[in-house]
């Protein structure tokens, strides 16, 4: 037996978290275009960190040393 809800709106506001509070300023700028490079610098940093992470995983998988730092 199925239950049909007549009220389609939700009354709960949701949970407020620390991470949500920290990220809220980023969401408030949604849809706006930043002048110049915008957030390309942040994206470059995260892409570089991700590439380093993948290199470390590849080193572990191959049991070799790609970056020999001495």
UniProtKB/Swiss-Prot annotation:
UniProt GO cellular component terms: chloroplast thylakoid membrane; photosystem II
One Gene Ontology molecular-function label: phosphate ion binding
Domain of life: Eukaryota
Subunit structure: PSII is composed of 1 copy each of membrane proteins PsbA, PsbB, PsbC, PsbD, PsbE, PsbF, PsbH, PsbI, PsbJ, PsbK, PsbL, PsbM, PsbT, PsbY, PsbZ, Psb30/Ycf12, at least 3 peripheral proteins of the oxygen-evolving complex and a large number of cofactors. It forms dimeric complexes.
GO terms for biological process, alphabetical: photosynthesis; protein stabilization
Source lineage: Eukaryota, Discoba, Euglenozoa, Euglenida, Spirocuta
One Pfam family matching this protein: PsbH
Family matches, as PANTHER family: PHOTOSYSTEM II REACTION CENTER PROTEIN H
Task of the protein: One of the components of the core complex of photosystem II (PSII), required for its stability and/or assembly. PSII is a light-driven water:plastoquinone oxidoreductase that uses light energy to abstract electrons from H(2)O, generating O(2) and a proton gradient subsequently used for ATP formation. It consists of a core antenna complex that captures photons, and an electron transfer chain that converts photonic excitation into a charge separation.
Location relative to the cell: Plastid, Chloroplast thylakoid membrane
Family to which this protein belongs: Belongs to the PsbH family.
Keywords: Chloroplast, Membrane, Photosynthesis, Photosystem II, Plastid, Thylakoid, Transmembrane, Transmembrane helix
Protein name: Photosystem II reaction center protein H
Ranges that cross the membrane: 40-60
Membrane-topology descriptor: Single-pass membrane protein
NCBIfam families in alphabetical order: PRK02624.1
